[in-house]
Design a protein with these regions (language model features):
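Structural preference for solvent-exposed beta-strand-turn elements
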Residues: 1-184
Length: 184
C-alpha cells in the first residue's frame, strides 16, 4: 500500500464503516480492506516481569542459528516443532531434535537465575532470529510465564505461547554406552 501511494505532500484519507470496511485513498490510489471487530482478536496476556534472563542479542541469535536446523518441520510430534529452553543457575541450554538429529547448545549467562524449563515454538525462534540485530553490545530480555514467553529488545516486544508438555529426556538419549563418541 505504501509503495502505491504517490508523492511526499499527498493527502491520505482513511474511512471506515460500521462493518469494519476501510477505504484508504491517496490521489489516484484506492485500497479497500475488510477489517474485524477488535473484540474478536485474542487477548494479549500480561506477563509478569519477575521471571526473566538477560543475554546479548548476538549470543541469542547464534544459539538459535546453531540449533534451529534440527527442529521438525511437520506437526506429527508437537514437541519436535519447538526447542527446549532450559536455564539452570548461570547456564542457558537450547535443545532441538527432529527424530534424526539432535542439537544442544549451552552458553554461560552473566548472572545466576532461577531454574526455568520451557518449550518454545520453532517458528517463534526463527522470527526472533530474523529481527535480532546480532549486536554484542545490545541485550535481549526473555520473560517467562506459565504459558507464554516474551522477548524484549530495542523497541520490540515479541510474545508467544509456549508448547505445553514434557520435552524428551535428553540425558537418557545421551547415555555413555556408545562405541564411538565425538565431542566438538
Amino acid at each position: 500500500i505504501i509503495r502505491k501511494l504517490s508523492g511526499e505532500n499527498s493527502t491520505i484519507t482513511i474511512e471506515s464503516d460500521e462493518k469494519y470496511n476501510t477505504t484508504i485513498t491517496c490521489d489516484k490510489a484506492i485500497f479497500q480492506i475488510q477489517g474485524k471487530d477488535g473484540d474478536e482478536f485474542s487477548y494479549i496476556p500480561h506477563i509478569e516481569r519477575d521471571k526473566f534472563i538477560t543475554l546479548s542479542q548476538f549470543t541469542l541469535k547464534e544459539i538459535i542459528r546453531q540449533t534451529i536446523f534440527s527442529i521438525s518441520p511437520n506437526d506429527s510430534n508437537k514437541m519436535m516443532t519447538g526447542e527446549l529452553m532450559e536455564v539452570t543457575g548461570n547456564e542457558l541450554k537450547l535443545v532441538s531434535l527432529d527424530g534424526h538429529r539432535m542439537s544442544i547448545r549451552k552458553v554461560a549467562l552473566k548472572e545466576q537465575y532461577s531454574d526455568i524449563k520451557v518449550i518454545v515454538p520453532g517458528k517463534t525462534l526463527g522470527e526472533i532470529s530474523k529481527i535480532l540485530n546480532g549486536d554484542n553490545d545490545s541485550e535481549v530480555q526473555i520473560f517467562f510465564s506459565t504459558n507464554h514467553i516474551m522477548f524484549e529488545f530495542d523497541d520490540t516486544i515479541v510474545l508467544s505461547r509456549l508448547i505445553e508438555g514434557e520435552y524428551f529426556r535428553i540425558n537418557q538419549m545421551l547415555s555413555s554406552d556408545y562405541e564411538t563418541k565425538v565431542t566438538l
